[in-house]
Amino acid sequence: LRQPKARISPEQYTRFIKMLWMVTQDEHVGFDVQPRRLGTFAIMCQLIIHAKTLGQALELSSQFYKLFGDEWSVTLERDKHEARLVPLIPKTLDPDHFITESMLMIWHGLASWLIERRLPLERVHFSYPRPAHADEYDALFFAPVMQFVAPRTEITFAADYLDLPIRQDEKTLEEFLKAAPAQLLVK
């Protein structure tokens, strides 16, 4: 952690995040106005696992998290050819963009897991200047286009993916949750 270019493995990151969850008793590890109780993500997953399509699952997930207030949200937008996931997080809660970047990775990883294949991103836009660690984004998002200082932060993919069926079920969800957040990190 003291070396700026050092990397940790997905397994080490998973252990670190789980330790933070236990210490803080907060799935958002202190980055939100109110703690997010442990198990919130699991309940959301139990809700969306019954959706028929990826689009339905992502919309349900978005609606679920809006129940907790307006501080954080992720909105799903769709037009004829493209779909976008747009996180909205107050800059005061996320000055280093850690939560924004984590949310993009988590939602992208969850969508990929639900359809049992990597959801190819067309673009990733960030509303902030290029950070020092931006070279790592290629390994995180695999998007051919990344733009900084964009009007808003969003990930964009082909809208057709929203019509794909959910390929997971309650049994695979149980294993997924035991290992979380590991599967959300590895593409």
Positions of the model-derived regions?
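Short, well-ordered alpha-helical segments
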Residues: G55, H97-M105, K171, E175
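Short hinge/gating elements
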Residues: A42-I48, L88-L93, L162-D163, A182-Q183
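Extended mid-to-C-terminal alpha-helical interaction segments
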Residues: A139-K187
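A generic structural signal for well-ordered coil/turn residues at beta-strand boundaries
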Residues: D70, H81, P120, F142, ...
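Beta-rich nucleic-acid/ligand-interaction surfaces
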Residues: L119-D138
